[in-house]
């Protein structure tokens, strides 16, 4: 049950990011001016009939956020009680600390009237929470645990390949930086600073500049760099590890998601930031990030056979085997 619940928590985090994207895309961040209450009501007692206009998006975001927070609390407790690997338990504690901090940042964002720095930090930390819940879902999955507990034999071919590890890490970090730049663009109002696509004011490079144009163009340049990195990473997997389903599947998914992300980015500009398209662009960017993270984690595990992650004790390994038999 733990793997299923962990996967559900990760999926709910993606829903939360989409809900947050809706708030920003509709300009509803201050539709509810108080926090942690909603117009003086306890969050779960606020009448549905009053959820109209921007209040709908902001209050919905709060409801989803509080639900995800509670789910992560349960996940952290479950890991503490049932997970034999100390480093996985620590991931649960870290996810809990991150989501609490995220909630506080969300409150400060409202109470301080959407300061850019806090809003950007709030958006950026959401991605970290998603990465943590996704990692927990991955390492508690039956396939990961079975292989880790029952086989410590590294893949000889993968052991000789250090390139994939390096480019996968670089790609994941680059995607996160790109998302932070995107959050900066959104929260500083630079989303339409360059109103055409794929050109910039009819040129490859803008002929005039201001801070918002610079931020917007940095996001486009970052998108090009990230796309090349993803193509290199996925291409390396498909050429050198085409027999490894654990690597091929996220590599192919990564190519599909980045193509979709470019399309959504273009449509965001061409549609003048239509809020659904804009929000889909936000959540799809998060999916690109965690897919790259999964590929990175699996590439390390494929090469080291679990050696990169602190080894669990023999008793813990036996515990995992017993649980697999009982399941």
What are these regions (language model features)?
Residues 135-149, 163, 167, 291-327:
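A juxtamembrane structural motif centered on a specific transmembrane helix
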Residues 79-93, 158, 234-254, 320:
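Membrane-interface helix-loop-helix junctions at transmembrane boundaries of multi-pass membrane enzymes
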Residues 49-71, 210-226:
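Individual transmembrane alpha-helix segments
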Residues 2-29, 173-186:
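N-terminal signal-anchor transmembrane alpha helix
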Residues 23-32, 100-123, 185-195, 262-286:
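Interfacial helix-loop-helix junctions of multi-pass membrane proteins
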Residues 176, 180-226, 231:
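Membrane-interfacial catalytic/cofactor-binding modules of polytopic membrane enzymes
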Residues 1-12, 88-95, 160-177, 246-256:
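Interfacial segments of alpha-helical transmembrane regions
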Residues 24-59, 191-213:
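Extracytosolic (periplasmic/ER-lumenal) interhelical loops and adjacent juxtamembrane/interface segments
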């Amino acid at each position: 049950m733990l793997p299923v619940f962990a996967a559900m928590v990760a999926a709910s985090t993606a829903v939360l990011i989409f809900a947050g994207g809706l708030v920003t895309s509709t300009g509803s961040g201050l539709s509810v001016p108080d926090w942690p209450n909603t117009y003086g009501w306890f969050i779960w007692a606020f009448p549905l009939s009053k959820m109209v206009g921007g209040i709908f998006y902001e209050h919905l975001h709060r409801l989803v956020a509080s639900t995800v927070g509670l789910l992560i609390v349960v996940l952290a407790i479950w890991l503490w009680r049932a997970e034999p690997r100390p480093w996985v338990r620590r991931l649960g504690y870290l996810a809990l600390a991150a989501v609490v901090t995220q909630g506080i940042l969300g409150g400060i964002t409202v109470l301080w009237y959407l300061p850019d720095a806090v809003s950007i930090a709030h958006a950026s930390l959401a991605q970290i929470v998603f990465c943590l819940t996704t990692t927990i879902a991955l390492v508690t999955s039956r396939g990961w645990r079975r292989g880790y507990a029952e086989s410590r034999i590294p893949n000889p071919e993968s052991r000789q390949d250090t390139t994939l590890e390096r480019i996968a890490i670089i790609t994941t970090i680059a995607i996160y930086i790109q998302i932070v730049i995107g959050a900066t663009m959104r929260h500083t109002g630079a989303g339409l600073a360059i109103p055409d696509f794929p050109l910039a004011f009819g040129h490859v490079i803008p002929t005039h500049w201001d801070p918002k144009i610079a931020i917007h163009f940095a996001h486009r340049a970052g998108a090009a760099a990230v796309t090349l990195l993803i193509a290199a990473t996925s291409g390396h997997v498909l050429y050198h590890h085409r027999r490894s389903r654990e690597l091929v599947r996220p590599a192919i998914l990564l190519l599909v998601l980045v193509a979709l992300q470019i399309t959504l980015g273009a449509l965001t500009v061409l549609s003048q930031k239509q809020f659904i398209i804009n929000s889909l662009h936000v959540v799809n960017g998060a999916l690109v990030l965690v897919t790259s993270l999964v590929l990175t984690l699996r590439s390390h595990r494929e090469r080291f056979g679990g050696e990169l992650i602190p080894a669990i004790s023999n008793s813990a390994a036996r515990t995992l085997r017993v649980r697999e038999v009982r399941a």
